[in-house]
């Protein structure tokens, strides 16, 4: 018994820089691929961080829920659905999985939809650069409870000590009247090594707790640098790595679902028993979870 990925959806087209539109589009595609109606989604969780025009209110999840066409009618007897933002940087998707497990395992909802993705608040570009190292992309994971011995194991989290390694903020002393389109991102010297250390600790905890053989496991990790997943795999003794398309830069909160979606599309999970999801980012903090694949790996997604 566990919580499994029913389907995935992504959006990376260049016709918009809006993360609300990209995330809503990814959500709709995941529902269409699974043949699941919007009213069957009880909860939508948005794990994205950087949003259109630095929107604070309303919750961006509500805007994405509307864009996805979920729970738009308020008639007597209609199925209830709600949404909320869960903002914890690069680890947000796995934290959302943690919440989804509690909801689905208690039959609180038939499906939980996790969306993630980031954009520059100026809505003027989609590719990463030195000042804002994150690429615009939207991704969705549709989850459901299953009686089969597949799906996510426990999500393990690790909090580091010292300075945050990576941080972002709007500099109110410099923004003037342009604050809604500005974002400052700072990466400390040696941030990759610090994130690697804490990610490895989280990954080992997940592997050891579930007694997983690294040889039969694929690593899907966050991408604070292009080589980070491979470095982490070497540290953990895992030979297989799957990554998202990094041609435009780091997709940040969308990295894990984008990589899983790509691996399923390319049938590159066949022959493996498990995926180890690991994310690490600001804090520094890290999260990891083992995902037991169905026999036909990824066929449902």
PLM regions and their residue ranges:
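Conserved "HGTGT" condensation-loop signature of ketosynthase/thiolase-family condensing enzymes
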Residues: 1-49, 53-56, 62-72, 141, ...
């Amino acid at each position: 018994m566990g919580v499994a990925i029913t389907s995935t959806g992504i959006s990376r087209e260049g016709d918009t820089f809006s993360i609300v539109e990209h995330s809503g589009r990814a959500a709709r595609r995941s529902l269409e691929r699974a043949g699941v109606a919007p009213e069957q989604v009880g909860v939508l969780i948005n794990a994205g961080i950087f949003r259109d025009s630095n929107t604070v209110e309303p919750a961006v999840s509500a805007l994405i829920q509307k864009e996805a066409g979920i729970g738009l009618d308020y008639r007597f007897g209609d199925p209830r659905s709600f949404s909320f933002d869960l903002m914890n940087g690069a680890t947000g998707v796995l934290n959302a999985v943690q919440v989804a497990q509690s909801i689905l395992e208690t039959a609180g909802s038939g499906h939980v939809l996790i969306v993630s993705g980031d954009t520059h608040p100026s809505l003027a570009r989609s590719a990463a650069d030195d000042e804002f190292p994150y690429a615009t992309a939207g991704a969705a994971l549709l989850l459901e409870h299953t009686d089969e011995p597949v799906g996510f194991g426990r999500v393990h989290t690790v909090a580091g000590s010292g300075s945050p390694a990576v941080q972002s903020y709007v500099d109110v002393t410099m923004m003037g009247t342009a604050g809604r389109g500005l974002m400052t991102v700072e990466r400390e010297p040696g941030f990759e090594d610090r994130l690697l250390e804490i990610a490895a600790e989280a990954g080992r905890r997940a592997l050891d707790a579930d007694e997983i053989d690294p040889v039969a496991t694929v690593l899907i990790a966050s991408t604070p640098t292009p080589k980070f997943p491979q470095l982490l795999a070497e540290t953990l003794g895992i030979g297989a790595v799957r990554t998202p398309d990094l041609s435009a830069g780091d997709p940040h909160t969308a990295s894990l679902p984008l990589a899983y979606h790509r691996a399923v599309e390319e049938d590159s999970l066949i022959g493996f028993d498990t995926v180890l999801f690991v994310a690490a980012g600001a804090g520094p903090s890290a999260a990891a979870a083992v995902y037991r694949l169905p026999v036909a790996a990824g066929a449902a997604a």
